[in-house]
Amino acid sequence: MRDFIVQWLTQITAPFWQSSLSIDQFVTALQETFQMVFFSLLFGCIWGLIQGITLVVTRTGGILQNRAIYYVLNPLVNALRSLPFIILLIAVIPLTKILVGTSIGTWAAIVPLTIYVGPYLGRLIETSLLEVNEGIIESAQAMGANPWQIIVKFVIPEARSSLILNLTTGTITLIGATAMAGAVGAGGIGDLAISYGYQRFD
């Protein structure tokens, strides 16, 4: 499939492609970017969903109100969200080496990208879930639903549209972060832009 795409793009762009960058390199960079986005978004969604749900249910008035958990998790999410990605990328190098075995490359970039996008998605998910009408939760409680059933069968389905919109926003943010990661050795489109764009600019 990959060879077919490279061959097809080469034929299409041959008349006007005037660059030392080959189509094969371009497709490889796209593949690396897709890999970083897909896995970081997958792990980030899982982590973000846990954070978002926890923030909603443990806040004051939540169905599992717990001030201790909320007042620890809330500032932690804010702190991680406000941390510039390039600083986070460097700060988690020891953790990346433990988990992946190296701090350079596409797989290594997935660790800081996941840590970066998780709290961001967590806050967006929290916002979406808080938009659900209180009456729906009260109705679920009146029917005898437990907290897990309330979240999974009532709140999340009701917030589905908002969750999809916020997931799109998170994905766009993540793509921007992958370009930044590529500039420091992660590969992908960011690496391509630095190697064949900025460094060769005359």
Annotate each language-model stretch with its function:
Residues 129-159, 199:
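Short helix-to-coil transition segments within interhelical loops
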